[in-house]
Amino acid sequence: EHQKLYMKRFGGYWRFPGMLDYCYLVNPYFPSPRLKDELRANFDTLLTEYPSGMYVNSLLAGKCFGVRQDYVVPGNGAAELIKSLMGRLEGKLGVIYPTFEEYPNRRVKDTLEIFVPQTEDFHYTADDVIGYFSEHRPDSLLLINPDNPSGNYIPYKDVLRLAEWCKNEGVRLVVDESFVDFSSEFPHNTLLRNDLLERFPDMIVVKSISKSFGVPGLRLGIMASADTELIAFLKKDVSIWNLNSFAEFFMQIYTKYEADYKQAAVRFREERSRFRADLSQIPYLKVFASEANYFLCEVLHPYSSHELAVRLLNEHDIL
């Protein structure tokens, strides 16, 4: 049917200029007009010249996020790096459901140790995670924070406590902080710091630049760890030119616009509060709290989630 055909595309919705894409996650307040102008001014050069290889691009990624070059690998979207990492991790992977499916989809099902929070809104704490996985011990543990799709958020100090538990138990911790810049503790809660990566050398931090920086068309993401052997493996596992020139140039110029980005994050949090209040006025939606750039809602009578999605598409061109 109509809606399923759109969903099979996974993007490319510029072909339908009347459509509003509320399916894929972006930042409406970044990149800033100044950054876009600089990209436009260099369009011809970037279109017609080769990008750099991994050495230069990992240097740029390290500069953007304040981590050592040998601790970070940039990818053609975080999805490219997730694929490599999921193939590399051995044994059981602890996953909290519902989750971003790209991680479990890259694993054999019987290698997953699944925790489903028994709460109405899928809320959970660091203690809940530690409690469950103390009894169902994985070799690696995935934490998406804020979580996707629930928007659940574990505060920074509790994430560090979870990292300490993993270190003591010999569990490798994978933290996906793709949405952390939308949280109320930003910018003080990132794990992309040399001292933290060195304190927890088995910890891996994933960040999709598409989501929070509003540039999904660039296909850009990073993975960081003080496990330099793992990072070196990931760098070799991707193709020689895994980033295009536009993605490289974005990293090259980003620090000039970092203040704009932080201002956009403040503006977004204000808009999220307003949007949640308005969304909560809709009688057939129960809106759950979120620290990300989306809300998980329970669809109530008279609609099912599918019926509502189809109606929004057919009557209002909203995906």
Segments predicted by a language model, with ranges:
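N-terminal "arm"/small-domain region of PLP-dependent enzymes with the aminotransferase-like
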Residues: E1-E49, H136-R137
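PLP-dependent aminotransferase class I/II
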Residues: G53, D202-Q281, L285-F288
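PLP-dependent aminotransferase-like
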Residues: G87-L143
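Active-site pre-lysine segment of PLP-dependent enzymes
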Residues: H123-S134, P149-L173, E177-S212
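Short beta-strands and strand-loop turn motifs
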Residues: E113-F115, S140-D147, V174-E177, A289-S290
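Conserved PLP-binding catalytic core of the aspartate aminotransferase-like
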Residues: R269, I282-R311, E315
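Short loop-beta-helix segment that forms the pyridoxal 5′-phosphate
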Residues: Y50-P51, G62-S84
